[in-house]
Structures are given as structure tokens and as C-alpha cells.
């Protein structure tokens, strides 16, 4: 790749139909974990006009009122009137949940957490870069900020015409592999009929874009596409069917890193699609925070029923202060990559997952997001002797 290029990432709001589905799946997981930390949960959701379908495999001693929970999530997300695409108070909720297969259980559950086998085979990636304060790629970082601001203004009532469904996309210009300025911002937001297109355009620029995008990244040539199709009245599940796990690039690094293909939401941490990816981020972020590299990608892979990973790879894209092989050896010494130890060390058996389902699983330094800590950075730096 040329050192001078344009790179684009997108984010979506919590009212986007796919994100509504993710929230429902993770809310169900949280309610189960509150009662049963040893539950096995794989929960998928589909939302469409006037209905939500919840399906999957769950083995637990907990009891959850699925229908009530689903309706609450839909309403809390802002869908409290059929004119918005779905009404959480009156929508149909279909429950098609079954138990986890005994064949999987016998290979995964081993008694002690330390011996827990991976819930499935798979490969996961973690990534970090020193482009932004939270060590996330710039395009996804700013895309998330735009969507969080849209939600804030909608919920506060400051822009009362905003509705829950929205998307943002940011294109950054890189020079010598460093982000220099924003080339293009695309933002589409659902709205009610009371606002004109000019008023909407001006309000989005002034109250959303200018509030979160640093002035130094905007140039006279920066292009804006605000609701470029014109009217955006029909949104949410009415405009598009929503499904759990369809925003995996929004959930991670905006396309700036590889993705193993596995979604996160609705899965308990015995599923390495989730816990392995969280561990990958934890490792990569600590490597960059330690100054071992400016940019780092970590791959781990697992076999179903096996506690230890089958492979580990570190790639610093030529930015490492020591070799990638040396960093791999340090990772193996500092981080325990057994599935049960990941769950234990990152404290993943807590009801924290609905918070992860919007605005990215990575890059938000909330107390619950233990994989965002950089508590291993000094250990890595000392071991690397740099």
C-alpha cells in the first residue's frame, strides 16, 4: 500500500436495526449472567416491523422473562411508537430458544475454569495503533464519536426531530502512513417530518460534526454528505431487517485490521469469538502502550474443547522496536491465553455486555471494559529492555 492514501470506516447508532438486535442479544446474556455465571449462551435476534424473533441455544439455571426484556430494550432504544419503525410496547416477540448441544458441552465444560475448553474453533484478531488517545484507528474512532453525539442530542431533546436510526462514515487522508485530515464525512440520520432538509443539514454540521471532530482535521476541501438521499423518515426495523452480528467491522476496527469472522453479541465468554477477540485487543493495546510498536495486530486461534490456543501471531507492520518474533515470546510469557484464564483475568463473567453492543467493543475506556486496560505495558517494556 502507498504511504499516501484515503481510508474509510463507518459506525451506526444504537437505533440501527442490526444494533437493536445486538442489544437485545446482549441484554438477554446479561440477565442470565446475573443469575448464573456458568450459563452457556448463544442468542440471536431478528427485528422487523412490529416483531422481534429471539433464537439460539441457552443452557442455564436462570429464568428470564424474554418477552418483557426484549420489549424494554426496544423501548429504551427510542422505539416507542409504530411510526418510528417498531413499538416496543406492542410488538410481537417470538421465542425460539433451545438448549446447547450435549456434544459441545462434553468437550467444553471440564469442571474448573482453568481447564475450560474453547466453545468452538476459530481465529480472532486484536489491534491497536497510536493514532488516537484510546489507541484506535482514526476513522472508526471519529465515526463512533459522531454517532454517540447523535444519540446524546436525541435523548436530551436538544434536537427533538432526531429519531433513533443513524449512520456515520469518515474518510481520512493519510500522508506517510499518518492521518492528516478528513477528506469526507457522511452522516445519515432518521428524523421526523417537522424538519426541513436545510435545517437538518445545518444542525448536523453545527451540533454534531463540529462538536466532536477536531478543527485541525477539517480543511476547506473537506466534503460533507448529510442525509444525501434527502428524506430519512422510514428507519429502524421498518426500513431494514435487523440481525445480531451483522456489524462486526463497526464492532471492531472499522476495517483497519483483519477480522476472524465471528460476531460477539449474545455469546457468553466461553465462546472464543468474543473472549479471544477481547484478549487480542488487550494484548495489542498493551504492546503499543508499552512503546514496543506504533501499530500492532495480534492473531490467536483455538480448537473446540481445547484450552490453549493452537497459534499466536504478532504483526507490527515494520513499526516494532524489537522483532515480531521477540514480541510473540514476550506475549507468551506475560499473558495466559487459556480460555478459562482469559475469562478469569479479564473478569468476563459479569453482566457488562449490553454496554459493549453500541459504538464499538474497543476504544471506550469504561471500568467494565477490562480489555482496555494497559496494566501490562510496564511489564512488557521492562522485559523488552527498551
Swiss-Prot record:
E.C. number: 2.5.1.6
CDD domains: S-AdoMet_synt
One Gene Ontology biological process: one-carbon metabolic process
One GO cellular component term noted in the UniProt record for this chain: cytoplasm
Chain residues that bind K(+): 44
Pathway(s) this gene product operates in, as recorded in its UniProt entry: Amino-acid biosynthesis; S-adenosyl-L-methionine biosynthesis; S-adenosyl-L-methionine from L-methionine: step 1/1
Pfam families, sorted: S-AdoMet_synt_C, S-AdoMet_synt_M, S-AdoMet_synt_N
Residues given in the record as ATP binding sites: 16, 165-167, 240, 246-247, 263, 267
Main location: cytoplasm
Catalysed reactions, as listed in the record: L-methionine + ATP + H2O = S-adenosyl-L-methionine + phosphate + diphosphate
Residue positions binding L-methionine: 57, 100, 240, 271
UniProt xrefs under InterPro entries: ADOMET_SYNTHASE_CS, S-AdoMet_synt_C, S-AdoMet_synt_central, S-AdoMet_synt_N, S-AdoMet_synthetase, S-AdoMet_synthetase_sfam
Cofactor(s) named in the record: Mg(2+); K(+)
Keywords: ATP-binding, Cytoplasm, Magnesium, Metal-binding, Nucleotide-binding, One-carbon metabolism, Potassium, Transferase
Record has Nucleotide-binding as a keyword: yes
Location relative to the cell: Cytoplasm
Ligand binding (Mg(2+)): 18
Sequence intervals crossing the membrane: none
Region (Flexible loop): 100-110
NCBIfam families the record matches: metK (TIGR01034)
Entry function: Catalyzes the formation of S-adenosylmethionine (AdoMet) from methionine and ATP. The overall synthetic reaction is composed of two sequential steps, AdoMet formation and the subsequent tripolyphosphate hydrolysis which occurs prior to release of AdoMet from the enzyme.
Similarity annotation: Belongs to the AdoMet synthase family.
Subunit and interaction comment: Homotetramer; dimer of dimers.
Record-linked PANTHER family: S-ADENOSYLMETHIONINE SYNTHETASE
Name the record gives this protein: S-adenosylmethionine synthase
Amino acid at each position: 500500500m502507498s504511504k499516501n492514501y484515503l481510508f474509510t470506516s463507518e459506525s451506526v447508532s444504537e437505533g440501527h436495526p442490526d444494533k437493536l438486535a445486538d442489544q437485545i442479544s446482549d441484554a438477554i446474556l446479561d440477565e442470565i449472567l446475573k443469575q448464573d455465571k456458568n450459563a452457556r449462551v448463544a442468542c440471536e435476534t431478528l427485528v422487523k416491523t412490529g416483531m422481534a424473533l429471539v433464537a439460539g441455544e441457552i443452557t442455564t439455571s436462570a429464568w428470564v422473562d424474554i418477552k418483557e426484556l426484549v420489549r424494554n430494550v426496544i423501548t429504551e432504544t427510542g422505539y416507542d411508537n409504530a411510526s418510528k419503525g417498531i413499538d416496543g410496547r406492542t410488538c410481537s416477540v417470538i421465542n425460539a430458544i433451545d438448549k446447547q448441544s450435549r456434544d459441545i458441552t462434553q468437550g467444553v465444560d471440564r469442571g474448573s475454569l482453568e481447564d475450560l475448553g474453547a466453545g468452538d474453533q476459530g481465529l480472532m484478531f486484536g489491534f491497536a495503533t497510536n493514532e488516537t488517545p484510546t489507541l484506535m484507528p482514526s476513522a472508526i474512532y471519529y465515526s463512533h464519536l459522531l454517532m454517540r453525539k447523535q444519540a446524546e442530542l436525541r435523548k436530551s431533546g436538544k434536537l427533538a426531530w432526531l429519531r433513533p436510526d443513524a449512520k456515520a462514515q469518515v474518510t481520512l487522508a493519510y500522508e506517510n502512513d499518518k492521518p492528516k485530515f478528513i477528506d469526507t464525512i457522511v452522516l445519515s440520520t432518521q428524523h421526523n417530518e417537522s424538519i426541513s432538509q436545510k435545517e437538518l443539514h445545518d444542525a448536523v454540521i453545527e451540533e454534531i460534526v463540529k462538536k466532536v471532530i477536531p478543527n485541525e482535521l477539517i480543511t476547506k476541501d473537506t466534503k460533507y454528505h448529510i442525509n444525501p438521499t434527502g428524506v430519512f423518515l422510514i428507519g429502524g426495523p421498518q426500513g431494514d431487517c435487523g440481525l445480531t452480528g451483522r456489524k462486526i467491522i463497526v464492532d471492531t476496527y472499522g476495517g483497519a485490521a483483519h477480522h476472524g469472522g465471528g460476531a460477539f453479541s449474545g455469546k457468553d465468554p466461553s465462546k472464543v469469538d468474543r473472549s479471544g477477540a477481547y484478549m487480542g485487543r488487550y494484548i495489542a493495546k498493551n504492546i503499543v502502550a508499552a512503546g514496543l510498536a506504533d501499530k500492532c495486530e495480534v492473531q490467536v486461534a483455538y480448537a473446540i474443547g481445547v484450552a490453549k490456543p493452537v497459534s499466536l501471531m504478532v504483526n507490527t507492520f515494520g513499526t516494532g522496536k524489537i522483532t515480531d518474533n521477540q514480541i510473540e515470546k514476550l506475549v507468551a510469557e506475560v499473558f495466559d491465553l487459556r480460555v478459562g484464564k482469559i475469562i478469569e483475568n479479564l473478569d468476563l463473567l459479569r453482566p457488562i455486555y449490553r454496554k459493549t453492543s453500541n459504538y464499538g467493543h474497543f476504544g471506550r475506556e469504561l471500568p467494565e471494559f477490562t480489555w482496555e486496560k494497559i496494566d501490562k505495558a510496564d511489564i512488557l517494556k521492562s522485559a523488552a529492555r527498551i
